[in-house]
């Protein structure tokens, strides 16, 4: 009997895709076997093409589908005259057709199966139709007593049949009563720990404003804080840290990031927060600030942003600022002022801004870098014009 299908188990759902509904198609297969013994086989005088048939058989007493075996002792035709041909014949069937696989074998003198041959697929049978093997076994091999295939001159054929019955569909819906794992609230929980100042063990004084914190959290998030609390520094022994180079609001936003990985007010203070992130080696926050500053680059602020990026080794921001300067310079030279990418403010020459003039005085190396980048980007486009060949 075939085993009935079952819906997917909850344990399987973590390793494979899960659909809202599912269906199993179970193809039922009925298997049965039949043994046919032919006594005094060597006396069979049937000529080539003549047939011996077994009695009919079925899968059970209530099965109306009847089968029989057909043997051509001296082959079916000239091609198989030196062979025994063996076929499975559908004698009667209540259906118009049926599909079945079959396997033939011989039983030797030790009652062991030998010389087995089987169909490679399920064949389509209709009433009166047979399938089998025209060259099942050579006659000379079969009749040779040394091979033990005709003990007491008896030929015993063994047949196994697998009949395909109707298919059955079993469908259903995936159970929604599986365990629902709550979302991770680590960031929210740590944020509440910071806001509520519970179990704090150190204190920061930022320009007169007090902030309480947890050494373990700070040390885990920042290598600078880790070094500060790990060594016998004054901040470690007194659990008190004085900070005079950061605005309290900037420090508060930085600490919110340390505890939660988020900085909701980043856009309002990206420049100052970049400096804080650089000072305390908060690399992710630093790149987040770079991204915010890149998205707000303008003719008026690009020089100041370039100085800021250079000061805090923000290489991605620095590259974007230089690229912005190059693009504005090229567009200005070409006179491209489309309303989409170029407005009246951008039309102002960057070199006329106070930020650029200040940068010339304080960071001349950045001016040189910007011009080098501009020259290298324009060389292919604005290279020395080639002399045109004179035409005769």
Swiss-Prot record:
Per UniProt, residues of the MATH domain are: 31-161
Q: Which family does it belong to?
A: Belongs to the Tdpoz family.
Role played? Component of a cullin-RING-based BCR (BTB-CUL3-RBX1) E3 ubiquitin-protein ligase complex that mediates the ubiquitination and subsequent proteasomal degradation of target proteins, but with relatively low efficiency. Cullin-RING-based BCR (BTB-CUL3-RBX1) E3 ubiquitin-protein ligase complexes containing homodimeric SPOPL or the heterodimer formed by SPOP and SPOPL are less efficient than ubiquitin ligase complexes containing only SPOP. May function to down-regulate the activity of cullin-RING-based BCR (BTB-CUL3-RBX1) E3 ubiquitin-protein ligase complexes that contain SPOP.
Q: How does it assemble?
A: Homodimer. Heterodimer with SPOP. Component of cullin-RING-based BCR (BTB-CUL3-RBX1) E3 ubiquitin-protein ligase complexes containing homodimeric SPOPL or the heterodimer formed by SPOP and SPOPL. Interacts with CUL3 and MACROH2A1.
Q: Residue limits of the BTB domain?
A: 200-267
Q: Which GO cellular component term is one of those annotated? A: nucleus
Q: Which organism is it from?
A: Mus musculus
Q: Report keywords, A-Z.
A: Nucleus, Ubl conjugation pathway
A single GO BP: protein ubiquitination
Q: Where would you find this protein in the cell?
A: Nucleus
Mostly located where? nucleus
Q: What is the name of this protein?
A: Speckle-type POZ protein-like
Molecular function terms, GO-annotated: identical protein binding
Associated pathway: Protein modification; protein ubiquitination
Question: Could you tell me the superkingdom of the organism this chain comes from?
Answer: Eukaryota
